Amino acid sequence: MRARLTSLLSGIALGLVLSAFPVAAAGVLQVGGTGAAAALLAHVGKPFTQQTGIAVEVKPGLGSSGGLSALAAGVLDVAVAGRALSGAEAARGLVPVITIRTPFVFVTSHHAPPSMTVPEIANVYTAEKVAWPDGSPVVLILRPREDADNHCIVQYFLGKGDVLGRARQRAELPVAVTDQDNAGMAERLKGSLAAATYAQIILEQRDLRMIAVDGVVPSIETLASGAYLPTKVLYFVHPLQPSAAASRFIQFLRSDEGVRALREAHTLPGVE
């Protein structure tokens, strides 16, 4: 019931958000999608605007699926998704053109979190009561069933089985609908533990500590070296026939200045 209600409310909110946005206009680049990329888009948008004179407007609150729907509807010029496109989305003429990587992390409001092993993180999802070393409770924050981050949680930490499904049956666990809700809830709740995207947490200057996994601290350097494995891939997507602003934006991101801006936004190139 809670999962269905969360999904329904997300759908209603998305409809209201899309209805408030005009169709993409010339001279302005309309971008949006996963909340994990909102601050990143604002960051890379500044040098793009300085170089081209094209203003960048980041539409909040869409999520990956909502951003791709808005792109197909002509509301956005470029969307950033936290997952690969579905067959139906590709059939609507959407094309992934650039991928970037950033560490996929667990964050907490705890002042001095320990390094955790992968099994220890998985245990937080299965055990009813887990405590930090000082005895204070670990408060796990979940994401909605359809959220793209769930794939990373399962891939890198939980493995096979419906561990997330069983965790959702625990009424005491809070659910954060958006990436910004997730980070905000993690800041507010004492002893929180939440999955998140490294670039978002750093760029939004969140008052959170990142969990070292098997003794390895997440960073762009440890991701690049292969020492830190959990990875979040972000997909820049535009229509089969992109707007002039979208084409210039993608061209910028592929330039030396754009690659530098993406690196400053705590991401690495992906595989195109």
Per-region residue spans from a language model:
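Bacterial N-terminal signal peptides
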Residues: 8-20
